């Protein structure tokens, strides 16, 4: 895979001065779309219309080229990303498409579109508070009272993650069997808001995306801090579902598809956060892990 990435990078460096006509990142040659009222939803499949994918460096960052035309966002903006690593990852998404372009599999492209167009028109503070609000309904904080086997499973699997987060950030989170959930101290919210404020807007888009997939800020922090793997975080977010499946069985194809999709979205969002973060140390640790 990295050979392909290096090839894309080398080709991209030879295409620094291409014409500025472009293709939309959601539909290629499609029309400019109006601003939606929520985050982008990838469109349906369409036939692949390009042969080669490359990256190039422009004034605003790194660009994606499909043949000799520059990729653009659904709102018609030049598709420009802040790092070469992210550009290579996005280019790989486009290059890996076969006869049919399946935009719903191109999570990095969708996250870039959201970051560039900001269809929900939210600022940094709003993104942060949307993520922190998930503490009120965080998956790992809600506990059942029965059956005892599930109570014990939640305690054994979720308590260590909560304990890690409390120690890592110096806060209190806790858990509850109440329908209203745990009472999160105001200081905990303040500390986590301050922590998330250290990320840039692009990374915050990725963080909120992962939080909405896992329904958990605690698990998302474990991922971004490299405390959990994607597989671990997804399993922990689905603990009760997996328990019920083990007990009652499941429709195999449906379960497998849902699980793989959740892993793919979570992995893409986590990678997006790291590739958009300003800390090169974090990126190096991610690549070496």
Curated annotation (Swiss-Prot):
Pfam families: ATP12. It is found in: Mitochondrion inner membrane. It is a peripheral membrane protein. The keyword Glycosyltransferase does not apply. It comes from the Eukaryota. One of its GO terms (biological process) is mitochondrial proton-transporting ATP synthase complex assembly. The keyword Membrane applies. The modification N6-succinyllysine is found at residue 133. One of its GO terms (cellular component) is mitochondrion. Residues 1-40 form a transit peptide. Keywords: Chaperone, Membrane, Mitochondrion, Mitochondrion inner membrane, Transit peptide. Belongs to the ATP12 family. Interacts with ATP5F1B; involved in the assembly of the F1 component of the mitochondrial ATP synthase (ATPase). Interacts with FMC1. Plays a role in the assembly of the F1 component of the mitochondrial ATP synthase (ATPase). This is ATP synthase mitochondrial F1 complex assembly factor 2. The gene is ATPAF2.
């Amino acid at each position: 895979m990295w050979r392909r990435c290096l090839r894309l990078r080398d080709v991209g460096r030879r295409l620094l001065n291409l014409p500025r006509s472009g293709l939309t990142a959601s539909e290629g040659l499609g029309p400019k779309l109006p601003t939606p009222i929520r985050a982008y939803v990838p469109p349906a499949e369409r036939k692949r219309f390009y042969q080669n994918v490359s990256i190039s460096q422009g004034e605003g960052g790194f660009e994606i080229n499909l043949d000799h035309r520059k990729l653009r966002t659904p709102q018609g903006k030049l598709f420009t990303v802040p790092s070469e690593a992210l550009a290579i990852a996005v280019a790989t998404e486009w290059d890996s498409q076969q006869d049919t372009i399946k935009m719903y599999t191109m999570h990095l492209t969708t996250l870039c579109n959201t970051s560039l167009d900001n269809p929900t028109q939210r600022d940094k503070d709003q993104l942060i508070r949307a993520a922190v609000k998930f503490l009120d309904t965080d998956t790992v904080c809600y506990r059942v009272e029965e059956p005892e086997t599930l109570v014990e499973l939640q305690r054994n699997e979720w308590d260590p993650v909560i304990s890690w987060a409390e120690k890592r950030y110096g806060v209190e989170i806790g858990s509850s069997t109440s329908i209203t959930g745990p009472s999160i101290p105001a200081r905990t919210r303040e500390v986590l808001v301050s922590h998330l404020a250290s990320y840039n807007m692009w990374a915050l888009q990725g963080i909120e995306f992962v939080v909405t997939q896992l329904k958990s800020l605690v698990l998302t922090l474990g991922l971004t801090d490299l405390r959990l793997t994607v597989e671990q975080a997804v399993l922990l977010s689905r603990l009760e579902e997996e328990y019920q499946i083990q007990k009652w069985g499941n429709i195999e194809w449906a379960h497998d598809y849902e699980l793989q999709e959740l892993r793919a979205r979570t992995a893409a969002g986590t990678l997006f956060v790291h590739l958009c973060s300003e800390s090169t140390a974090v990126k190096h640790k991610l690549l070496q892990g």
